[in-house]
Amino acid sequence: MASLLGTSSSAAAAILASTPLSSRSCKPAVFSLFPSSGQSQGRKFYGGIRVPVKKGRSQFHVAISNVATEINLLKNRVRNLLEESQRPVYPFAAIVGQDEMKLCLLLNVIDPKIGGVMIMGDRGTGKSTTVRSLVDLLPEIKVISGDPFNSDPDDQEVMSAEVRDKLRSGQQLPISRTKINMVDLPLGATEDRVCGTIDIEKALTEGVKAFEPGLLAKANRGILYVDEVNLLDDHLVDVLLDSAASGWNTVEREGISISHPARFILIGSGNPEEGELRPQLLDRFGMHAQVGTVRDAELRVKIVEERARFDKNPKEFRESYKAEQEKLQNQIDSARNALSAVTIDHDLRVKISKVCAELNVDGLRGDIVTNRAARALAALKGRDKVTPEDIATVIPNCLRHRLRKDPLESIDSGVLVVEKFYEVFA
C-alpha cells in the first residue's frame, strides 16, 4: 500500500497501518440502485465492489463501495504529515546581505544555460543556507508523468530515448507539472550512484538494457548542489562538469552504452582555506561568487536575531516572509518568460569581447556567459534591452575565476575585471 500512495516513509506506513480501509473516519462512498426492495444475495469482489442480486420479478440491487475515495483521503493525510515533518527551509527573502551570491543564483534560475555558479567564502557565512533556501523559489515545469528523467514534452533535446520512441510511434503521453528538483550530492557518493548503473546480468540473459538512474538523471532540468565541492574526488568533478557542459550523461559498462539527458544547473560551494579547484574545472562554472564575513555590527546583530526567530518558530517566521517570497517568485517567472525577447546591442557585445581579450581570458566561455548573464539581469529588472550597467554588474562574477593567477599580484581578480571594464566602456 505504501507504494500505491507514492511514499515509503515510516510515518506514512504508520498511518496506513493504523487506518483500515473501512474505518469510521474514512467512510466509502456508496452508490445504490433500488428499483424494489427485498432480500438479496450476492458476491463481494476485490476492490470494494459488491453486487448483491435478488431473484424475482423486476427486482435489482447494486451497491458500489468507492475504495479510491478512501485511498485519496489517506494520500492527503500522508502528504500533510510529510510536509509537516520535513526540515523547514530558511526563506530566501530573509537572507541578510550576500547580494552577490543571491544575484548569481537568481540569474542561473532565470537562464540555466549560464552554466551554474561556484560560491567560495569563509565558513559560517550562509553559503549552504542560501542555496537550499532557493528551493522555495523554483518555478514549476512540464514533465512526462512517470519518467525518471523529467523529460520535457516540448523539447526533444531533454527527452529520454524511451519517451522519444513513444512519441514517434504516436502514443499519447500523460503530462504533469512539478517543481524544479534540487538534488544534493554527498561527498561520499560513488560514480555509480552519480551516473547510474546498468544491470549486466539482465542485459546478457534477457537482452534488455536495464538501467538504474542516478543523481544526474534526477537532476535533469533541475539543480545539482555540491557542498564542499573542492573536497570532492577529481574524477567525480570531471563527470559532473562534463555532463553539465554537454547536457547528456553516458554510462558505459561491458560494451553496453546508455545515454540520457542531464541538463542541470551545477551549484558548488566551498571554503578556500580547504583548497582551490583546478583552473580548468573553475572555468566550467558559469559564474563565481565570493562571500565574505559581515563586518558591520548592526548587520551581524540583525542576522543573529533573525536566526533566533527562525529557530524558535520556523513556521511563523516563514509566514512573515510569505509575501516577499511570492513577489520574488513571480518576478522570476516573469523574467524566465521574457528572457527570449531581451536583446543586446552589437557594440556592447564587441566591448564585452574586448574586455575578455585584454584580460587574456582563455577560450570564449567568458564572452558567452557574460552575454547570457547580462540578458538574464535585464529580464529580472523587467527590461527588454541590456544596458552597460547590467554588464558592469555581472562581468566580475563571469570573469574573475577565468583570469590566470599571478602569485605576485596583490589586487583581487574581481577588481582587475572592474578596472578593465571601465577602461573599455569609457
Curated annotation (Swiss-Prot):
Function: Involved in chlorophyll biosynthesis. Catalyzes the insertion of magnesium ion into protoporphyrin IX to yield Mg-protoporphyrin IX. The magnesium-chelatase is a complex of three subunits, CHLI, CHLD and CHLH. The reaction takes place in two steps, with an ATP-dependent activation followed by an ATP-dependent chelation step.
Transit peptide residue numbers: 1-50
Keyword annotations of the record: ATP-binding, Chlorophyll biosynthesis, Chloroplast, Disulfide bond, Ligase, Nucleotide-binding, Photosynthesis, Plastid, Transit peptide
Gene: CHLI
Tissue: Strongly expressed in young leaves and to a lesser extent in mature leaves.
Location in or out of the cell: Plastid, Chloroplast
Enzymatic class: ligase
Protein name, as recorded: Magnesium-chelatase subunit ChlI, chloroplastic
